[in-house]
A protein has these predicted regions:
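Alpha-helical scaffolding within the catalytic cores
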Residues: 4-6, 39-49, 144-151, 169-181
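C-terminal domain-boundary segment and adjacent tail
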Residues: 13-23, 102-105, 132-153, 194-234
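Metal-dependent polysaccharide deacetylase catalytic core of the NodB/CE4 family, i.e.
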Residues: 14-123, 187, 192-200, 204
């Protein structure tokens, strides 16, 4: 992180990009409603405040990394997740996440929710809209994927803004280029998601090394500015 984060900040500054960072309070696997509060907030504040200082925003990813799904979801061997015991347990976890964000970043408005691994059940989606007015935007997947919550760019009937992410990672292959170009043509929109641990995962480019991955991101941002100079940075 001592190299990756300063480089990411430099990319944002050089290309006038404002990041959205989303919070996971912990990586505990409990889905029965048991809450273990995160007491060490130093790293959250360190990275979060730098992101805010650069003009970015903070949002929500999860109390833990367990998607908001009940026992009627069967991930099989596809995803290594558990389901929640009941809706009350899901609600308790999201409530804790929001309290954690408020306590860690007092006075900072957060409205974006990014589902863990892009998985969000119908029950979880309904609960967010009904019980958590703080969440005004959901950012999941534009393209289909197994168990993925797939979105169009729209305002849903319940008022939540559906704002899918189009591409992700630092392996800028032909498929990603086609997807990005298609969305510029259709909606004149671009959105991109990157995990801090992409550079540790071979499937997401670790074998390339960070310098190559960083170069890919810089080239992509250059292309975006050249191809769509009037695109607003929101």
């Amino acid at each position: 992180m001592d190299v990756w984060w300063p480089d990411m900040q430099e990319l944002a500054s050089d290309h006038n990009v404002r990041y959205t960072g989303v919070i996971i309070e912990n990586y505990e696997d409990a889905t029965d409603g048991t809450i273990k509060k995160q007491k060490d907030t130093r790293r959250f504040q360190y990275f979060g405040n730098m992101l805010l200082h650069q003009g970015g925003e903070l949002g929500y990813h999860g109390y833990n990394h367990q998607p908001l799904s009940l026992s009627n979801a069967d991930y099989g061997d596809v995803l290594p997740y558990d389901t929640w015991k009941n809706e009350a347990a899901m609600k308790k976890a999201v409530k804790e996440l929001i309290h954690f964000g408020e306590d860690t970043f007092p006075g900072v408005s957060m409205s974006v929710y990014v589902p863990p691994s892009n998985v969000l059940s119908a029950e979880g989606r309904k609960m967010l809209a009904k019980d958590f007015p703080e969440i005004r935007t959901i950012a999941s997947n534009y393209f289909t994927g197994e168990f993925a919550y797939v979105q169009e760019f729209e305002v849903a009937k319940d008022g939540i803004v559906e704002q899918p992410r189009i591409i992700s990672g630092a392996i800028i292959d032909n498929y990603m280029k086609m997807a990005a170009l298609s969305e510029l043509n259709m909606h004149f929109v671009n959105s991109h998601f990157i995990h801090p641990d992409d550079l540790l995962d071979e499937d997401r480019g670790a074998a390339l090394g960070w310098e190559k991955m960083k170069g890919n991101l810089a080239d992509y941002m250059d292309w975006l500015v050249d191809s769509a100079p009037s695109l607003r940075q929101l």
